[in-house]
Amino acid sequence: MPSSREIRNKIKSVKNTQKITRAMEMVAASKMRKAQDRMKKARPYGEKIRNVAAHMSNASVEYRHPFLISRDSVKRVGIIVVTSDKGLCGGLNTNVLRRALNEIRTWETEGNHVDACCIGNKGLGFMSRLGTQVISQVTGLGDAPNMERLIGAVKVVLDAYTEGQLDRVYIFYNRFINTMKQMPVMEQLLPLTDDRISSEDGEARPTRAPWDYIYEPEAKPVIDDIMVRYIEALVYQAVAENMASEQSARMVAMKAASDNAGNLIDELTLIYNKSRQAAITKELSEIVGGAAAV
């Protein structure tokens, strides 16, 4: 059994750790609320640009954007993996990376080549160790998604798709369900599917819209720009969801760590009291034995 001094030092060490985890829990709770607000504020823009993109995809008959055209054969797949830069958030990153790994193995088994765009340091490190080619990356976003920093990495993927270097693009991220639940999801970004180009209530739009916009000077550059902005909005929304999930998972993980530290302190205190009681009993027995001998 360890000595009383060793047990006291252990209790002190666990208490110090508990103070840190409690502080991190409170910080994560504050950041979580802000991340949820950012996520909700991003939705109106995403809905509006989706409506515009949906109308353009059906209204303009003179030009069909490449993002809307499905390719017959798929040989090269691009993935955008959204993770956090930091750890201490439970199994959040592990879950989404496991989902991505399963899909990568399936594609490679089918003979497809996979290129990755990594948003977040954890995903970048994982893809580098896995040996997957990383064509673009963004790390150090902090506590708020920055569209200006995301655009460069996303543009590399979009250009690769437009030039035929990628035949399909998917995005992996953690969808925020509630404070206690985050779900790793995979969604197809390119080519845009019917569920992406749909009305706000989820119903598919008619094959031919009854009216169209007036394009100045022509439709092609306007549609090109809108489609790119739409994909950027989808990626931004995914990053915002992942950040809200990250702070929620970190708050829950730090609360669990604080609770476990409290339980460990109780157990160590009990061991310390038993050890101290045994030492006192031993001393009393020695005193009584010595007095009886006299």
UniProtKB/Swiss-Prot annotation:
MF term (GO), any: ATP binding
PROSITE patterns xrefs: ATPASE_GAMMA
Pfam family membership, one: ATP-synt
Subunit structure as annotated in this protein's UniProt entry: F-type ATPases have 2 components, CF(1) - the catalytic core - and CF(0) - the membrane proton channel. CF(1) has five subunits: alpha(3), beta(3), gamma(1), delta(1), epsilon(1). CF(0) has three main subunits: a, b and c.
Family, similarity comment: Belongs to the ATPase gamma chain family.
Keywords: ATP synthesis, Cell inner membrane, Cell membrane, CF(1), Hydrogen ion transport, Ion transport, Membrane, Transport
Membrane topology, from the record: Peripheral membrane protein
Gene Ontology annotations of biological process type: proton motive force-driven plasma membrane ATP synthesis
Subcellular location: Cell inner membrane
Chief site of localization: membrane
GO cellular component, as recorded: plasma membrane; proton-transporting ATP synthase complex
Name of the molecule in the record: ATP synthase gamma chain
Entries under PANTHER family matching the protein: ATP SYNTHASE GAMMA CHAIN (PTHR11693), ATP SYNTHASE SUBUNIT GAMMA, MITOCHONDRIAL (PTHR11693:SF22)
NCBIfam families assigned: ATPsyn_F1gamma, PRK05621.1-1
InterPro entries membership: ATP_synth_F1_ATPase_gsu, ATP_synth_F1_gsu, ATP_synth_F1_gsu_CS
Function, in words: Produces ATP from ADP in the presence of a proton gradient across the membrane. The gamma chain is believed to be important in regulating ATPase activity and the flow of protons through the CF(0) complex.
HAMAP family (alphabetical): ATP_synth_gamma_bact (MF_00815)
